[in-house]
Amino acid sequence: MEPSEKSNGYEEAAKLFMSERDSLTGVSTVRQWSRTLVRGSSILDLGCGHGVPISQALIEDGFAVYGVDASASLMESFRKRFPSAHAECSAFEDSAFFGRTFDAVVAVGLMFLLQPDVQCLLIHKVKQALNSNGQFLFTSPKEKCIWQDILTHRESVSLGAQFYREVLQAEGLILVGEMSDEGNNLYYSVRKP
């Protein structure tokens, strides 16, 4: 299967996404979270899109960002914006970046686009990719719910905070806390012991 077929509809909606996602929503929350990391730390950005605003903020703050996205159009834009960043056009499930480890992983706006079993796979793969004391930040609604994605018109699924806590605990990961951004998006801050 081509990476763009695993983009959850974002290859087809890439132009609209890039025009809509240039806002700074989430940047202050991600920057607050990243303050616990040492400048220069390696961060894997899963579902990085065109890199704005999350990868951009992390790069500006001196982190070594590795971006992964299944949309060829979004990845092309990412590479143009950040030519020195590591980038891979791939679904996270197939990413070669999981052959190494990272100080942190972010998945902002990705988790709920995935089917439930793939969400659990993502958490498992992140655990394996994190260094000891590595940090993981992802977004998904607190409530267990299903809705239609505004850009792709595809189904989005939140498994709910309690389910995420249980999966994280089963993987040996520690939920450090929850944060919200100015758009009321819920962030789960996780640490690998």
Which sequence ranges carry the predicted segments?
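Class I (Rossmann-like) S-adenosyl-L-methionine-dependent methyltransferase catalytic domain
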Residues: 1-38, 49-97, 114-121, 125, ...
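Nucleotide donor/acceptor-binding cores
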Residues: 41-42
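Conserved beta-strand/loop positions that form the S-adenosyl-L-methionine
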Residues: 46
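A conserved beta-strand element that flanks and buttresses the S-adenosyl-L-methionine
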Residues: 106
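Short catalytic micro-motifs in class I SAM-dependent methyltransferases
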Residues: 109-113
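Glycan-recognition surfaces
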Residues: 129
